[in-house]
C-alpha cells in the first residue's frame, strides 16, 4: 500500500466549499459523460451514523472502457466500471473505489476540511500516526495540468470572480489570501500484485493528483455559477443533473458485477471526493512491451514423428503389465 497526504488550498471558506464541491462534481460528471461512458449515480440519499450523525451516502459507477489506455482495453470486459462509494459527514468524508475485475486493487480516501493554509500536520494523527506517508501540496494556480485538460477560462492565474472579487492567483498566493481553506486528503492506494505493486501504486497516485488538481481548479473557476446557491438549491441542481447524466450514459446490462462494499463498523459517509478524469491513452513506460522484441524459440519450427511401423508395443513381465514403447531389435 502506498499512502500519501494531499493538501489543496482554495480561496474559499469551508462552508463556501461545501456548496462549490457539490456543484463542481455534478457539472464535471455531466460534461465528461457520453453514451456508454461516464459517471452513473446509483444511490444518493441521507444517511445517519451513530457516531458522526447526519450525513449523505452516495454510490456511483464510473464507466471507463474508452477512457482506458489501449493496453488495458485489450484485457478488460467491453462494459467495465469502477464502483465509488462515499460517506459524508462534512467536514469529514470517506470515499472508496473498488473493482471486481481487479480484486487486489482499491483506493481509500479520507478527507477533512479546515479554514487554514494547510498548516495542520496532525489532522490525521489518529488515523495515520503509525503509517509512513508523503505530504504533497497541490497548488491550483501554479501546478501544471495535462495539456488536454487546460482551459484558459478555468485558469486561476487569469480568472477573476465577479461576485467575490477573488482571483488572478499568483505564485505564493496562499501566504496572503483571505479567506483560505484547505482540503486534506489521506489517500491509500493498494495493488497487491507481486512485481507490479510499487509501480502501479505510483502511477495511480499520479492520476489521483491530476484529478484533484483539475477538480479544485474547476470548483473555483465556476464560483460565480454556484456562489449564491443555498444547500437546498445545490441539492436540486445535483438531482436534476444526475438524472440528465444517467440518461446521457444510457442503460447498461449487468455485464460485470462489482463487489459490494459493506458499510464499515464506524459507518463513514461522504460525497464523491473528486470527479472522474480520463486516463492517458498510452501505457506507462513500466508496462510497455517492446515493439520489436524477438520471438523466443523454445521448440523447433516443425515436429517430426517416428514411423509407426518402426515401433512395437512391449509388455515386460514384472512391470505391472504397463505397456511401453520400444524399437524392434
From Swiss-Prot:
GO terms for biological process: signal transduction. The keyword Cytoplasm applies. Signal peptide: none annotated. SUPFAM superfamilies: Bet v1-like (SSF55961). It catalyses: a 1,2-diacyl-sn-glycero-3-phospho-(1D-myo-inositol)(in) = a 1,2-diacyl-sn-glycero-3-phospho-(1D-myo-inositol)(out); a 1,2-diacyl-sn-glycero-3-phosphate(in) = a 1,2-diacyl-sn-glycero-3-phosphate(out). It is found in: Cytoplasm. This is Cytoplasmic phosphatidylinositol transfer protein 1. InterPro entries: PI_transfer, PI_transfer_N, START-like_dom_sf. Residues 267-329 are annotated as: Disordered. Belongs to the PtdIns transfer protein family. PI transfer class IIB subfamily. Its main location: cytoplasm. Keywords: Cytoplasm, Lipid transport, Lipid-binding, Transport. GO terms for molecular function: lipid binding; phosphatidic acid transfer activity; phosphatidylinositol transfer activity. Catalyzes the transfer of phosphatidylinositol (PI) and phosphatidic acid (PA) between membranes. Binds PA derived from the phospholipase D signaling pathway and among the cellular PA species, preferably binds to the C16:0/16:1 and C16:1/18:1 PA species. It comes from the Eukaryota. Pfam families: IP_trans. One of its GO terms (cellular component) is cytoplasm.
